[in-house]
């Protein structure tokens, strides 16, 4: 039994990128750099108990941006009883507000740490490499 991207061709996958975006589509091909092409692709955003999809069609994803990918069980793709589908505009606004809230919380944590005498000289990000 072999493992790798070859086993995922023609299957419906979810792909999570380094920036947190999530794409769902049918993988049609890949190359030696793990670049992949998805067909019938949607971008999905989750905020709280809500989600929204944006149709993108045929979509190319660079392999170095992929954090994780996996096959989607069609029967359990979205547990719609637990998640509420809302419009793309509503979800992007909610996601922006959530991002601002997280940034404010991080600033507060840093301020409290600094006032307590704890400092972090440098915070490394994967994009720094």
Swiss-Prot record:
Q: Where is the Sm domain?
A: 1-75
Q: Does the keyword RNA-binding apply?
A: yes
SUPFAM superfamilies assigned: Sm-like ribonucleoproteins
InterPro entries assigned to the protein according to its UniProt record, in alphabetical order: Lsm1 (IPR034104), LSM_dom_sf (IPR010920), PTHR15588 (IPR044642), Sm (IPR047575), Sm_dom_euk/arc (IPR001163)
Q: Name one GO molecular function term.
A: mRNA binding
**GO BP of this protein:** deadenylation-dependent decapping of nuclear-transcribed mRNA; mRNA catabolic process; mRNA processing; RNA splicing
Transmembrane domains' residue ranges: none
The subcellular location is: Cytoplasm; Cytoplasm, P-body
Cite the SMART domains for this sequence.
Sm
Cellular component annotations (GO), alphabetically ordered: Lsm1-7-Pat1 complex; P-body; ribonucleoprotein complex
Q: Which keywords annotate this record? A: Cytoplasm, mRNA processing, mRNA splicing, Ribonucleoprotein, RNA-binding
- Keyword check for Cytoplasm, yes or no: yes
- Reported function: Probably involved with other LSm subunits in the general process of degradation of mRNAs.
Assembly:
LSm subunits form a heteromer with a donut shape.
Similarity comment: Belongs to the snRNP Sm proteins family.
Q: State what protein this is by name.
A: Probable U6 snRNA-associated Sm-like protein LSm1
In which organism is this protein found? Dictyostelium discoideum
Instruction: Tell me the name of the encoding gene.
Output: lsm1
